[in-house]
Amino acid sequence: MQLRCTASREGKLESFLRRELSMSSSLVSRLKWQDALLVNGEAVHTNHPVHPGDAVAVRLDETVEGFEPEEMALSVLYEDEALIALDKPAGMLTHPSPSRNEGTLANGLLTYYRASGQKCGIHPVSRLDRDTFGVVLLAKNAYVHEKFRLLHQSGGMKKTYAACVFGAPEADAGTIELPVYKLGGGSLLRAVDARGQQAVTEFAVQCRWAHTALLALHPVTGRTHQLRLHCMASGFPILGDPQYHSDASRAFSERFGICPQQLCAVRLEFCHPITGEATCIASKQRVRCPEETAATIG
């Protein structure tokens, strides 16, 4: 990917990049050692002067190190030069971790990029738990990733999840506000505890059945395991969840053979960080609701 723009006033290139392109100082510092900065077609350093009318270009090519490419089938929902959205299956990590360096979505994406001749990085914008499925968004370079970080901070990304739960909220719509606390001892589990971080989830009931319900969930905050914990703590755990469940929800899930947890990132809406266009990406997957054969959230 290459950014191109025209200088409108005098100044140093570094100031131009930070002011006009909103680049972080760390990214500018990294680019200056990669021969990635050009003014009027000439590779220059960050202290190079720019004048009104100068053509400035920034090459944002990246390489990926630290894990190996793997052949795997990927479901690409959307792609352009700045980002890619994949439909992640359940049971797969988004990115390698210290304990697992293979079999992740990123391993397959590395093969995809190399096969298509793309010099892209792998920067997850949205991550999903191993057993949560649906839309995963990844930036192709650090510049776009930083744009998404700022978009997150300003509330410019809307995520919609579908969840089939055991039980149901009394109200048809509402907000769950419960702090999420990370348990100690190296555990990944979270608990509702006053010592935790503020966490807010909006919900809307889409369908109700005798024992279960289909919910649309909108995480206002993005804490680890937030949706799963909030549903369980509110009395309607997600079906198939191996960690955040009640005895009754686990028994019901086992009775109907529900595995993995029925939580799907069905839709992601945002303003494209490069084009400025309203963008909506939808998963092709759906949660399984045993009391309804075709439950969807459009």
Where in the sequence are the language-model features?
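RNA pseudouridine synthases
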Residues: M1-G184, P290
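Short beta-strand micro-motifs in enzyme catalytic cores
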Residues: I84, Y161, A213-L215, V266
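Well-ordered beta-strand positions
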Residues: L77-Y78, D129, Y181, A204-C207, ...
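Short, surface-exposed secondary-structure edge patches
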Residues: H45-P49, A216, P260
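Pseudouridine synthases involved in rRNA/tRNA modification
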Residues: M1-R30, Q197-V200, V205-T212, V220, ...
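Short histidine-centered loop motifs in beta-beta connectors
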Residues: G41-A43, A210-L217
